[in-house]
Amino acid sequence: FKFRQSPSSPRFRLNSRNWALNVTTPLTVDSSSSPPIEEEPKTQRFDPGAPPPFNLADIRAAIPKHCWVKNPWKSMSYVVRELAIVFALAAGAAYLNNWLVWPLYWIAQGTMFWALFVLGHDCGHGSFSNDPRLNSVVGHLLHSSILVPYHGWRISHRTHHQNHGHVENDESWHPMSEKIYKSLDKPTRFFRFTLPLVMLAYPFYLWARSPGKKGSHYHPDSDLFLPKERNDVLTSTACWTAMAVLLVCLNFVMGPMQMLKLYVIPYWINVMWLDFVTYLHHHGHEDKLPWYRGKEWSYLRGGLTTLDRDYGLINNIHHDIGTHVIHHLFPQIPHYHLVEATEAAKPVLGKYYREPDKSGPLPLHLLGILAKSIKEDHFVSDEGDVVYYEADPNLYGEIKVTAE
């Protein structure tokens, strides 16, 4: 690998002939860059923004070797399972066509659409298999079916992983600086910090990214992409367009009401799952977690700001995406090994790993955490290399006045 600076952005991207490996960490890590692991004195208050007393090599060494093995047959079995459930749910709901059944169908099918997204996400990381062609074909089928441009999103998600925890360079649910926050118009603030509206943000993010950033996941000349990625982006946008055309045709064949019930409402449930899960993996801990700039940022320190979450019965359905810390540090580990890899890494991570609150059958406990974070986490300081979220005390009074 070699680092190459994007001509349109100050952030750095990994340059490799194999795009699947662009979202990973080096196979060998210099273990001399950090001091040996030492036990923290019990009387010392833990500072989550302090450099950790371990490095990536220490964590990697603790993870069993078999956790890195990708089994394409096992990965494909999950695809077959999820697609079978999706079609069975749609067929059952259409056959029964009962208003007592439809709400249950919407929740179940929306959750399954989200499960399809996670499998496509694994294809984008290359953790689905070692075959880039298989990853690309399966990823396009899964993501296009739920109106996600596979390569466009894969590339922006690569940027997210390579810059996780960096105030300016992170891509997903990154904090706004106070200057950018204050430059937002009132409708944008209302949308961004009001539930449930903010949980519907994903399609708008695909079209126009986040406040303070420019470009689109659909346009090959976007700031998100390098010139060599143009054909990939065009391919995914074409697949997205083909799916959109198919949905329009089905609308004429089946009728708009049937399409609304079978696809449109589950699609938006899927969007809410996606925003809910991805937001809480980077926000909402009871103690404020740091965000970094400049020399204070490193791949390891940024990755340690992510959070694991327990989703109860949903853990298995959405492929243990809640085991997020190890996934962020080592995205090449297949999802079916993440729980074991996390357990093995915990002794090394120590207090830098934050044990998630245990969920009941459904992750209802996370709703209060989400609401609290949306209310309190608005922006970070324009200055400083280690910063924490701050709240705008006037935001909701301003929103109320605007609404009236």
Swiss-Prot record:
Gene name linked to the record: FAD7
Q: What class of enzyme is it?
A: oxidoreductase
Pinpoint motif Histidine box-3 by residue range: 324-328
UniProt domain comment? The histidine box domains may contain the active site and/or be involved in metal ion binding.
Q: Which GO terms describe its biological process?
A: unsaturated fatty acid biosynthetic process
Report the subcellular localization: Plastid, Chloroplast membrane
Q: What does the similarity note say?
A: Belongs to the fatty acid desaturase type 1 family.
CDD domains on file: Delta12-FADS-like
Q: Which organism is it from?
A: Brassica napus (Rape)
Would you name any one GO CC term? chloroplast membrane
Q: What does this protein do?
A: Chloroplast omega-3 fatty acid desaturase introduces the third double bond in the biosynthesis of 16:3 and 18:3 fatty acids, important constituents of plant membranes. It is thought to use ferredoxin as an electron donor and to act on fatty acids esterified to galactolipids, sulfolipids and phosphatidylglycerol.
Q: Which GO terms describe its molecular function?
A: oxidoreductase activity, acting on paired donors, with oxidation of a pair of donors resulting in the reduction of molecular oxygen to two molecules of water
Q: Which InterPro entries match?
A: FA_desaturase_dom, FAS_N, Fatty_acid_desaturase
Q: In which pathway does it act?
A: Lipid metabolism; polyunsaturated fatty acid biosynthesis
> Which keywords are on file for this protein?
Chloroplast, Fatty acid biosynthesis, Fatty acid metabolism, Lipid biosynthesis, Lipid metabolism, Membrane, Oxidoreductase, Plastid, Transit peptide
Q: Does the keyword Membrane apply?
A: yes
Q: What is this protein called?
A: Omega-3 fatty acid desaturase, chloroplastic
Q: Where is this region: Disordered?
A: 28-50
Q: What is its main location?
A: plastid
Q: Cite the EC number.
A: 1.14.19.-
Q: Does the keyword Protein biosynthesis apply?
A: no
